[in-house]
Amino acid sequence: MSNMQQKTDVILIGAGIMSATLGSLLKELAPEWEIKVFEKLASAGEESSNEWNNAGTGHSALCELNYTSEKSDGSIDISKAVKVNEQFQLSRQFWAYLVKSKLIRNPQDFIMPLPHMSLVQGEKNVEFLKNRFEALSKNPLFQGMEFSDAPETLKKWLPLIMEGRTSNEPMAATKIDSGTDVNFGALTRMLFDYLKTKDVELNYKHSVENIKRTKNGLWEVKVHDMNSGKIEHHTAKFVFIGGGGGSLPLLQKTGIPESKHIGGFPVSGLFMVCKNQKVVEQHHAKVYGKAKVGAPPMSVPHLDTRYIDNKKALLFGPFAGFSPKFLKTGSNLDLIGSVKPNNVLTMLAAGVKEMGLTKYLIQQVMLSHEKRMEELREFIPNAKSEDWDIVVAGQRVQVIKDTDAGGKGTLQFGTEVVSAADGSIAALLGASPGASTAVHVMLEVLEKCFPSRMVEWEGKIKEMIPSYGISLTENPRLFQDLHTSTGRTLGLNEKETVHN
């Protein structure tokens, strides 16, 4: 291929879960549009979406304590939990539509039912968990949640965690059987297999080097074909930058005003993986603890049953690491290269503000295998060092920006869409809850970037995602109907019963 320009309707940068979701939505809504995908790696879903590079939790705030905060009067604010759960329901509905329409098959290859549990120790934390349980139980999205502080019940729910426990400190847990384990790598690959059948052009080992606006208002994307060594130029009416940690540097190249005063701080994750299958079989849940006082939200410890390559696995973490790379396969110059005249003050302000995070990362990097084992033994008292290995997970780039509430250089912990005023280009930045809310986030991209089409598309969107634009909290019967029907389609209901 030569230097000549090639025109298309849509360019998706990065072959992860976000581009896969947006591409799938667009192919259902505007099947005639030409779509090209450019991915630096040799196949889809190999960076943040890869099953070993994320926790695989279907984040719906069933067990993640950082989505419910305690107010000054002791009551629990569940608004964030409700929001995250509602967003996950959109993903669940879209996946069920794809399976029912036979656009993807074998849902058990990417989603499995799994109890989600919260576990706390200490009188104050037990009281918090009970208050959280009572607050969530009033909401239809959290029906079926159980609470217990009785040791005999906890032994039944958590045999591996309770075995060998000598402390008399009070403990409590909540349990809900409607949780899920999601293999986002497998799902991403399935979606791209489907897109290939719809004539979407998938270009692997193609690295995007630059993005600039042409005189006629299109976007020109400069691509390095790593197979041939040639440089290609592609133009499109709409570009989506879904390159995980690599999105910020590409967004900066666009020069759009919305890309200014935004920085990124990379945090790498590590998990411990159990290599003793006898131990793996003794646990069947995702169990989330409470972050230590002063620790950032990404540090919440959890012990997870996972299904990877259709095999049961057991992981514990995350432990944080530090690398200046924005991608696992990135460059050590990524962080310094992202500092620009327009964001240097934002970055410096964050550095001053986030001394606690810096200290936490330094402490985490210094941890030995035995120190990590000590943390694991807070969950599994009888854990043996020889049964556990360390796995390096993906890089997450936390967004740093100036906000009215937090001032200059405020660290963001969510997922964020940044788009041009005219909607011709959009980028996804940030980390958790990430992939779980992919459908909600990509619908936000459609709303921001194609506002004039939304009336025309609304009927089809509601066919695919029936609760689009509706609060399920306020429509409990609709939630129950959709939860049952999507569970049936995705093969979750029967298996939920089997494991109870």
Curated annotation (Swiss-Prot):
- Decide whether keyword Mitochondrion is in the record: no
Q: Which InterPro entries match?
A: FAD/NAD-bd_sf (IPR036188), MQO (IPR006231)
What EC number is given for this enzyme? 1.1.5.4
Give cofactor(s), names only. FAD
Instruction: Return the Pfam families for the record.
Output: Mqo (PF06039)
Q: Which GO terms describe its biological process?
A: tricarboxylic acid cycle
Which pathway?
Carbohydrate metabolism; tricarboxylic acid cycle; oxaloacetate from (S)-malate (quinone route): step 1/1
Q: Which UniProt keywords apply?
A: FAD, Flavoprotein, Oxidoreductase, Tricarboxylic acid cycle
Keyword Flavoprotein on entry: yes
* Reactions that this protein is recorded to catalyse: (S)-malate + a quinone = a quinol + oxaloacetate
Any GO molecular function: L-malate dehydrogenase (quinone) activity
**SUPFAM superfamilies named in the record:** FAD/NAD(P)-binding domain
Q: Which family does it belong to?
A: Belongs to the MQO family.
| Name of the protein this chain belongs to | Probable malate:quinone oxidoreductase
Q: Which organism is it from?
A: Bacillus anthracis
Gene behind the chain: mqo
